[in-house]
A protein has these predicted regions:
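Catalytic-core segments of hydrolase enzymes
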Residues: 1-56, 99-101
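N-terminal low-complexity, intrinsically disordered patches enriched in charged
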Residues: 29, 76, 122-124
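Short intrinsically disordered coil segments
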Residues: 33-36, 61-63, 68, 131
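Substrate-binding/active-site groove segments that recognize
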Residues: 44, 117-118
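Hydrolase catalytic cores
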Residues: 50-112, 116
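Secreted peptidase-domain scaffold signal
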Residues: 121-131
Length: 131
């Protein structure tokens, strides 16, 4: 891995949820890119565990591994559950709810974004006005 850590394509796109990885002590993982984007937007949006993450190896063993590619499915599952619970919400509304449930939402930055989302908090927020 090189020394470049800045967010780039496709993670810097508008209207997407960019997920960074944190270690077990909730610190930005050394391989996880940071913002801002070229036009100054905060990225990553949120963080999830990705260092280490238990995964199934090609041989069927459970092994620890690292990567934002392991953090992203955790958040994708959260988004899918929220959207299933609130099918009338737009993608933008769901993503905003996820961001606002992050433990860093009061002061988002370009290292942790809005922080680690809280599923229960996001669910309560999403369903509060869901008719």
């Amino acid at each position: 891995m090189g020394t470049w850590k800045k967010i780039n394509v496709p993670a810097d796109a508008h209207d997407i949820l960019t997920v960074g990885a944190v270690s077990l002590d909730k610190v930005n993982a050394p391989f996880s890119s940071i913002g801002p984007t070229a036009d100054g937007r905060i990225k990553p949006d949120v963080m999830a565990y990705g260092c280490p993450t238990n995964v199934v190896s090609g041989r069927g063993y459970i092994i620890p591994d690292n990567g934002t590619s392991f953090a992203c499915p955790l958040i994708a599952g959260m988004v899918a559950c929220l959207w299933q619970a609130c099918p009338n919400k737009s993608a933008k509304e769901i993503l905003d709810i996820v961001r606002q449930s992050g433990n860093n939402c009061q002061s988002p930055d370009n290292i942790m974004g809005y922080g680690i989302p809280d599923f229960w908090s996001a669910y309560q927020s999403a369903t509060r006005y869901n008719q």
